[in-house]
């Protein structure tokens, strides 16, 4: 899954307060830092897949990209993959502190490395975006969902996620959303015109389905496939309920 850069709603976007566009180095050679994912390279989640594809794509276009991973591992704290430099940042394993501690420390590190653009992924890690702004950095926030709506986040965590949302809406030079519903949300709640860039998939050569047939006994058109995280907000229970009501002989 990659993030395309060709879809926008409306056709152009500039903050009403006249925020600057980030040029000055002819774009090529520009230093970009990415903060918010858990690991790189990784396919553990949508954020990680998108960061991996976007970072590698920018490197191929001549940008210098640093991605900040969460957690320190002996001997693997700084490494380069596909031309992308990955730096691991200490953080606590406790879920309520993980993204918060990591995003602040990663921001401070990025500020010491003369990055031109700091790109935050998800609203939780975007709280220190305002610090990057104070240091004159061009900031981008890609909203990967309104995480405070997820049932597992309550109390302090939910309030912190809402804070990240407000910071991104008010201070990010560029605010990117992945769906029209989120575009409408930021327009209506914050009067903020975001950039709509839906996620996309890489087209690959189709492979024969022998393995699926041999391993699972499935034939084309004989099953319904759900691909996604098993969590309430993804609606798997709705899928199961609908499947039972359909009285179909297809496998789920």
Task: For the regions a language model picked out, list residue spans one by one.
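N-terminal subdomain of nucleotide-sugar transferases
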Residues: 13, 21-72, 244-247
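A short, charged, and often flexible helix/loop element on the N-terminal side
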Residues: 82-108, 151-157
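A structural motif in glycosyltransferase catalytic domains
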Residues: 51, 224, 239-240, 252
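An aromatic- and histidine-rich active-site surface loop
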Residues: 100-111, 115-144, 148
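Carbohydrate-associated surface elements
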Residues: 181, 200
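Membrane-proximal helix-turn-helix segments that form the acceptor-binding/catalytic region
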Residues: 108-111, 134, 158-175
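Conserved donor-binding/catalytic core segment of Leloir-type glycosyltransferases
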Residues: 33, 218-234, 240-247
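A short helix/loop element that forms part of the nucleotide-sugar donor recognition site in Leloir-type
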Residues: 206-218
């Amino acid at each position: 899954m990659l993030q395309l850069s060709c879809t926008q709603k409306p056709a152009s976007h500039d903050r009403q307060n006249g925020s600057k566009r980030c040029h000055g180095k002819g774009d090529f050679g520009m230093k970009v830092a990415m903060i918010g994912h858990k690991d790189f390279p990784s396919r553990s989640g949508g954020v990680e897949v998108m960061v991996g594809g976007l970072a590698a794509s920018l490197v191929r276009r001549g940008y210098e990209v640093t991605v900040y991973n969460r957690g320190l591992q002996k001997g693997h704290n700084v490494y380069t993959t596909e031309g992308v430099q990955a730096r691991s940042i200490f953080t606590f394993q406790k879920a309520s502190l993980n993204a918060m501690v990591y995003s602040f420390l990663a921001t401070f590190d990025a500020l010491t490395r003369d990055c031109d653009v700091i790109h935050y992924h998800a609203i939780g890690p975007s709280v220190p975006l305002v610090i990057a702004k104070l240091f004159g950095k061009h900031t981008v926030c890609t909203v990967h969902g309104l995480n405070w709506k997820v049932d597992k986040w309550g109390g302090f965590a939910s309030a912190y996620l809402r804070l990240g949302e407000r910071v991104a809406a008010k201070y990010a030079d560029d605010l990117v959303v992945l769906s029209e519903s989120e575009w409408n949300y930021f327009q209506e709640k914050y009067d903020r015109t975001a950039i709509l860039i839906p996620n996309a998939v890489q087209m690959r050569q189709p492979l024969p389905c022998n393995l699926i047939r041999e391993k699972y006994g499935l034939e084309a058109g004989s099953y319904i496939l759900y691909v996604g995280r098993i969590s309430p907000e993804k609606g798997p229970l709705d899928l199961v309920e609908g499947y039972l009501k359909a009285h179909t002989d297809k496998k789920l």
